[in-house]
Amino acid sequence: MSRVKRGVTARARHKKVLNQAKGYYGARSRVYRVAKQAVIKAGQYAYRDRKVKKRTFRSLWIVRINAAARQHDISYSQLINGLNKAGIELDRKALAELAVYNKDAFAAVVEKAKAALA
C-alpha cells in the first residue's frame, strides 16, 4: 500500500481558513492557528447577531412608532391597544414604515385606533 502524504489537503484547508480571515488585523489574518480561532469566533458572533438583529430592529420600529404616535397625542401602548380593538392587523415593521414615509396614512391609522378606544 502506498503512503499518503497530506500536504495538498493541509494546504487547501489552511488556504480556506486564511481566505476567510482576510482583512483581519495582524496575526489573525496571517497565522493559521490564530486565524482559525478568529474565524470560528467570527462565525459564533455572526450566528448570535443574526438573532439579535431581529430584536434590535423590533425595538427600533417601536421607538419610531412611539415617536410618531406621540405627535398625534397617543402613546405607543395605547396605539397598539386601539389597533387590536379595531381589528387592524398591521405589524410593527409596516407601522414604522408608514410613520416615517407616509405620514398621512399613519395619521389615518391612528385615528382609527383612537376611535376604537373611545
Swiss-Prot record:
GO terms for molecular function: rRNA binding; structural constituent of ribosome. GO terms for cellular component: ribonucleoprotein complex; ribosome. Keywords: Ribonucleoprotein, Ribosomal protein, RNA-binding, rRNA-binding. It holds the Pfam family Ribosomal_L20. Coiled coil: none annotated. Belongs to the bacterial ribosomal protein bL20 family. This is Large ribosomal subunit protein bL20. The gene is rplT.
